[in-house]
UniProtKB/Swiss-Prot annotation:
Keywords from the UniProt entry: Nucleus
Gene Ontology annotations for the cellular component aspect, listed alphabetically: INTAC complex; integrator complex; nucleus
Species the sequence originates in: Drosophila melanogaster (Fruit fly)
Protein name per UniProt: Integrator complex subunit 6
CDD domains linked: vWFA
Localization terms from the record: Nucleus
All residue ranges annotated as the VWFA domain in the record: 3-134
Composition skew (Low complexity), residue ranges: 752-781, 803-824, 1053-1074, 1125-1141
């Protein structure tokens, strides 16, 4: 905080006038204008925010303080305008009062630190600006020729300093020497110093005086003063030779003073000659604010006191206001500083001393400085002077006292002994501590902490008891002075406040006017010859008047306006006068010369508009107020603020759109946010699922699943990662405002919302990390589903996409518990009617007929009606929902009726893997879907079929998964069979999945399981996933289906299935295999090699786990049917493991002979990865890349990614260039699939759903072309495999 104190001379001599800009002004008015100009210039600088302005006059205290510590800026300006000239020119007393006002605050803040060193960073910079006329100094006892500052002991703490001022207080004076006549104002050169006694006072404090001769010079002086207002302290620099030269010179001078004004004359040759010679000078060192602390400066080292502190002294000797620093000559080498050792650096104001140092231009030389203390007998350096590297300024470096002895000790402590000093180094350090003033110890401790000295060593080197260097008497004295100064300042502020509250006469500025005589009088004013001589004499006596200024008289009494409404209010003596005024007012209502008495206001009151507005009457109301229009339905002027986004991002806000490939509402591809699934890659996982899709806690042995899997896994607490966010595509078209018509039917539009219950998101991406299958995305299919009155679900579905995804939900079952908690989908009791636009038909050329599949599966209409029964209490019907609303509706655990019975809700767009895990908790996450076939395991061997609508053309059915888990104590193994909708369960547990649609029968009542022959499985759970499809029933399709069936049967393939309670028979491809009994062991599976579907089976051993992927070619539709049997056998001590199968394939329904072979042996395996060991002739072999080729392809794709991302960000809907660049992607199937998924995610990040759909469509088409090319190349081989 910078204090700027204006001391304005208010003596009577300030009434003299000066000629300023053609107008005569008094010195006091000029002084007021100078203060206002200073404030205006100061406000342009950066440091003006922390300024405090004070205003003092030459009056007696406390009336001399017009604005002190407590007054604000408004009070300062008001008091400045009201200053008046009266009193004496008591310069000395006024200066003393100004210093005392400043020193009171210093004593209570304690920034002077008496007896504890002098810290330059503890400062309160103050500038005292005296504006006077430079006349004689008149006091009450006479006129004096010099300034006398009276010594007053009223202010506490004055005896500690010899002078009344401090080292951060400077005095400047503006001495007005402006004449009363017109002169040339512009003066070249610098403004001279004044020769009055005030000049010597200014030089003592480190300031100067200005001799002001004109108003132009006054503005120059004010600009100079504004530049000098900088934080800093004033020091006195004196020259000094080394001690031997000083003693030699002292001996020759016979006791005379060796130090003269010009330095030391080196007459003796005992010492070196000084390299710099200068006179003692008082100059300022600038103490700048710290970089990190913008409010106050930060320092580390004090300047030593001029005396050695004595702990037994009862008082402190007085110090000089400005420290006297002795500069040692000649220069010495700059000391080597320790890293992180604190050093204070201050810039020195320009002077002859700094000029000589700069002229030396010595880079590594410095001049040491000391402070003389005659009491102790010797002086040691505490800093040095050194030029800046650019030789533009000189800096004062302040370090510890006797730093030449300290720095080598610290260097050895850090670099030589590594903070483990020996005893001799400790002795040296203790000797150094005893040789410095005690008040340096706290600063030295902070410096040692800065260089990372350990705390234990620091306590040993500098114990805290050395800080008590002041005697108790002096400490108590300083504390008492501080309290007294605080009380005195409060009393002074209260006196100032009271005297400012006293009423003052209003200030009125003197109004002046100039007289212009106009044209000069002509000589021939009178043309008559007899009168010309007489008037010529009178004309000669008239003196010309030029630039004469007169003072306009001010009315002292303002006549109030009179009202003559009541004539009895007029006094009798004023009747005659008032009648004349009334007559004049009546006959002439507007006076030519209006009275201005009502407009005469003081300047200070002219800007007070608030009081005028308060007293002003409110305007009258209107006679006929206008009615304000009320808008009944909102604000008609309010505009819809739709943000303009890039490309087609905001089109879905108006109405849901359909993409060309029918990927759900808004054209969002599956896996995108509008497709209700997490994007590619691992999603948020629940407790029990790792983020990367691997095994999590509570699910031992479970392989890593895809990113879509993580969004569907449920832990013990419920949903993990379920989202409640509504997509922008869920907003339908807005109805126009107005009343509803009578025939209006309310229909709730479909929304892509997520349930807030424990059910997790459905229809997520099914690609596992590491599964490079492109196009393995979820198909959002439309379904109209409603629960009938009798509780039976009815559904009608239509296909909207040619791609379907298999996303997996993992569930585990307790091995020791008698019941398994499962999450079942419950139907919302609210009846909802969904509206869908069935514009697009199925992309399937010849869709499978539902009646044909009923005939194939042996499900007749009679059986359908006969099986419609109530569901047991242990099972819960799967809820019906739309595919456009794939939300999990209230998944809640339910207890099964029998210990080993699992109720599996049909999941639209997702597939459920189930496992038997000993010791793991059971939780099945299911998404709400249309009702489907429930294949309930009977005796662990066969499954019974309830209704399921198999949707989507190229679906990815879940192949049969059997898990063999060892019982807790038995050696046998139980089988858990999971079959696809429409598949034929076999006796050996192999189910054949069909891509078909079965007509909706009634739900199946659960059949209790009979115990197995060898062992009892702990629990069993099965999962089922169905994809939606729409099949039209017409004669052409029926004929096509029948012809396909007959053709296949002609080739010798037949199949039949029987569902029984204890046994199951299955016949596939003419080879029958019958298993009777309760259990199937791994040895049984190994002995099934005679069957045709075991041709690709691979056995890993009798004790290990066996996994086989078997392609079966079913005669129903020309589609591929994969049956993979994953059996895991474990011992009694180990838990069972789960093996899942992701089977992704593309359909080609144009020909029944086009078959595709996929062999998958593990969860997330590639469609082209052969794990069987024996490849069939119809299998498409993958491209095998070496590591070098993969690395080269990866680098190529990285460079290509920049260009493709640039194409994604480019506005517009022409994606031809983007697709051309996508064709340049290199690598195997995994790398290309990952790259396409990354591009889809990037396009969705910019909300470019149509671009993502185009990329997905391009990739699917490319995959289909690849598959078609492979299949056409080997038709005969496929037929041979089918016949085998």
């Amino acid at each position: 905080m910078t204090i700027i104190l204006f001391l304005v001379d208010t003596s009577s001599s300030m009434c003299q006038k000066a000629y300023v800009n053609g107008v005569q002004k008094t010195y006091l008015d000029i002084a007021k204008g100078a203060v206002e100009t200073f404030l205006k210039y100061r406000q342009r600088t950066q440091d003006c925010l922390g300024d405090r302005y004070m205003l003092l006059t030459f009056e007696e205290p406390p009336a001399n303080v017009k604005a002190g510590w407590k007054e604000n800026h408004a009070t300062f300006m008001n008091e400045l305008k009201n200053l008046q000239s009266h009193g004496l020119t008591s310069m000395g007393e006024s200066l003393r009062n100004a210093f005392d006002l400043l020193n009171l605050n210093r004593m209570q803040s304690g920034i002077d630190t008496y007896g504890q060193g002098r810290c330059p960073f503890y400062l309160e910079p103050s500038v005292i600006i005296v504006i006077t006329d430079g006349g004689r100094y008149s006091y009450r006892n006479g006129v004096h020729q010099e300034i006398i500052l009276p010594l007053s002991n009223q202010i506490p703490g004055t005896k500690f300093t010899k002078e009344p001022f401090r080292w951060d207080q400077r005095l400047f004076s503006l001495v007005l020497r402006m004449p009363g006549n017109k002169i040339d104002e512009r003066v070249d050169g610098k403004v001279p110093h004044d020769d009055s006694p005030i000049e010597r006072m200014c030089e003592v404090t480190g300031g100067r005086s200005y001799r002001v001769r004109s108003h132009y010079v006054l503005n120059q002086c004010i600009e100079s003063l504004v530049q000098k207002v900088q934080p800093g302290v004033v020091l006195q620099f004196e020259p000094m030779l080394p001690k031997e030269a000083t003693s030699a010179t002292a001996g020759e001078a016979a006791g005379a003073s060796t130090i003269s004004g010009m330095g030391i004359s080196s007459t003796s040759g005992a010492g070196p000659a000084p390299d710099i010679v200068f006179q003692p000078v008082k100059k300022m060192i600038y103490v700048q604010k710290h970089i990190t602390q913008k409010t106050f400066p930060i320092g580390y080292w004090p300047l030593p006191e001029p005396y050695w502190p004595d702990s037994k002294a009862i008082t402190l000797p007085p110090r000089d206001a400005h420290p006297k620093l002795k500069v040692l000559t000649p220069a010495v080498d700059e000391p080597q500083l320790v890293r992180s050792f604190p050093v204070d650096k201050y810039e020195i104001e320009g002077c002859p001393l700094t000029l000589q140092i700069l002229n030396k231009r010595e880079m590594n030389k410095c001049w040491q400085v000391i402070v003389t203390n005659g009491m102790h007998g010797f002086e040691l350096p505490f800093g040095y002077l050194k030029a800046a590297p650019n030789f533009s300024q000189v800096h004062l470096y302040v370090l510890a006292y006797n730093y030449p002895a300290l720095l080598p000790i610290l260097h050895d402590l850090i670099h030589k002994y590594n903070m483990s000093p020996p005893s001799d180094l400790m002795y040296k350090f203790n000797a150094y501590v005893r040789s410095i003033p005690p008040y340096y110890c706290p600063f030295l401790r902070k410096a040692l902490v800065n260089i990372n000295v350990p705390y234990q060593l620091l306590q040993f080197l500098l114990p805290e008891n050395v800080d008590n260097y002041l005697s108790p008497t002096i400490a108590n004295q300083l504390k008492h002075i501080k309290n007294t100064a605080k009380q005195d300042q409060e009393n002074l502020c209260m006196k100032v406040y009271k005297q400012l509250k006293q009423p003052k006469p209003p200030y009125r500025q003197v109004e002046t006017g100039k007289l212009f005589t106009g044209a000069p009088l002509r000589r021939d004013l009178v043309r008559h010859p007899l009168l010309r001589d007489i008037f010529s004499k009178l004309h000669g006596e008239i003196d010309p008047v030029e630039n004469y200024t007169i003072v306009v008289p001010q009315p002292t009494h303002q006549s109030s306006a009179k009202s003559h409404r009541n004539p009895f209010d007029i006094p009798r003596r004023d009747l005659v006068e008032e009648i004349a005024k009334m007559r004049e007012t009546l006959l002439r209502p507007v006076s030519l010369v209006a009275k201005d008495s009502g407009h005469c206001l003081p300047i200070a009151e002219m800007g007070n508009y608030q009081e005028y507005l308060k007293n002003k009457d409110n305007p009258l109301r209107e006679i006929e107020p206008t009615n304000v229009r009320q808008h009944m339905f909102g604000n008609p002027y309010k505009k819809d603020k739709h943000m303009v986004m890039v490309d087609e991002a905001d089109l879905s806000d108006v109405a849901p759109m359909k993409s060309p490939n029918g990927n759900g509402p808004g054209g969002a591809p599956p896996g995108s946010p509008s497709g209700s699934g997490s994007p590619t890659g691992p999603g948020p996982s629940s407790p029990g699922s790792s983020p990367g899709g691997g095994s999590g806690p509570g699910m031992p042995g479970m392989p890593g699943m895809g990113g879509g899997m993580s969004g569907l896994m449920l832990g013990a607490g419920g949903s993990g990662g379920s989202s409640k966010k509504l997509d922008g595509t869920s907003r339908g078209r807005k109805r126009k405002a107005g009343p509803l018509p009578r025939s209006f039917e309310f229909r709730r539009s479909s929304t892509d919302s997520r349930s807030s219950s424990s059910g997790s998101e459905s229809s997520t991406t099914g690609s596992a990390p590491g599964s490079p299958i492109p196009g393995a995305t979820s198909s959002i299919s439309g379904c109209d589903s409603a629960m009938g009155a009798d509780g039976g679900p009815s559904s009608s579905c239509f296909d909207e996409d040619s791609n379907s995804n298999s996303s997996f939900v993992s569930s585990t079952s307790e091995a020791s518990a008698s019941d398994s908690g499962m999450s079942n989908s419950h139907l919302d009791p609210l009846r909802i009617s969904f509206v869908f636009i069935e514009e697009e038909t199925s992309d399937q050329d010849t869709p499978l007929n539902g009646y044909v599949h009923n005939f194939i599966n042996g499900i007749s209409d009679d059986a359908e009606t006969g099986e419609t029964e109530a569901v047991p209490g242990g099972a819960s019907l799967p809820g019906a929902s739309s595919a456009n609303e794939p939300s999990s509706i209230g998944a809640s655990p339910a207890v099964s009726a029998t210990p080993a019975t699992s109720v599996i809700p049909a999941s639209n767009g997702s597939e459920v893997c189930s496992a038997v895990a000993a010791g793991s908790s059971s939780s099945i996450s299911s998404s709400a879907s249309s009702p489907g076939v429930l294949y309930v395991p009977l005796n662990g061997l066969t499954t019974h079929a309830a209704y399921s609508s198999n949707l989507g053309g190229p679906s990815s059915p879940l192949d049969n998964l059997s898990s063999l888990g060892g019982a807790a104590g038995g050696g046998g193994s139980g089988l858990l069979g999971v079959s696809k909708p429409g598949s034929l369960p076999l006796a050996n547990g192999y189910g054949h999945g069909h891509s078909s649609a079965i007509s909706p029968p009634s739900p199946l009542s659960l059949v209790p399981l009979s115990p197995l022959g060898t062992s009892t499985p702990a629990a069993s759970s099965s999962g089922l996933s169905s994809s939606s499809a729409y099949f039209s029933h017409n004669d052409i399709n029926d004929a096509s289906e029948i012809s396909r069936i007959l053709q296949t049967c002609h080739n010798g393939t037949s199949s039949g299935s029987s569902v029984g309670a204890g046994a199951s028979n299955s016949n596939l491809n003419g080879n029958g295999s019958t298993e009777s009994g309760g259990g199937v062991s791994s040895d049984d599976h190994a002995s099934l090699g005679g069957n045709s579907f075991d041709a690709l089976k691979r056995t890993a051993g009798t004790a290990g786990s066996t996994a086989a992927g078997n392609p079966h070619y079913y005669w129903a539709s020309g589609l591929n049917h994969h049956n993979n049997n994953n059996s895991s056998a474990a011992g009694a001590a180990s838990g069972s493991t789960l093996s899942n199968n992701h089977n992704h394939r593309g359909h080609n329904n144009s020909s029944p002979n086009k078959l595709e072979v996929k062999i998958n042996s593990s969860c997330g395996s590639s469609p082209t990865h052969n794990n069987g060991g024996m490849g069939s002739p119809g299998q498409s072999l993958p491209l095998i890349f070496t590591e070098e080729q993969r690395e080269a392809a990866r680098l190529h794709n990285v460079e290509l990614r920049l260009q493709i991302f640039r194409d994604i960000r480019r506005p517009g809907r022409d994606y031809s260039q983007l697709l051309e660049h996508l064709n340049l992607v290199k690598g195997d199937q995994d790398m290309q699939s990952d790259f396409v998924d990354m591009c889809i995610v990037e396009s969705l990040r910019f909300r470019r759903h149509r671009m993502a759909s185009s990329i997905q469509e391009w990739w699917d088409r490319k995959q289909q072309l690849t598959a078609v090319g492979t299949n056409e190349a080997t038709p005969s081989a496929e037929q041979a495999v089918a016949k085998s």
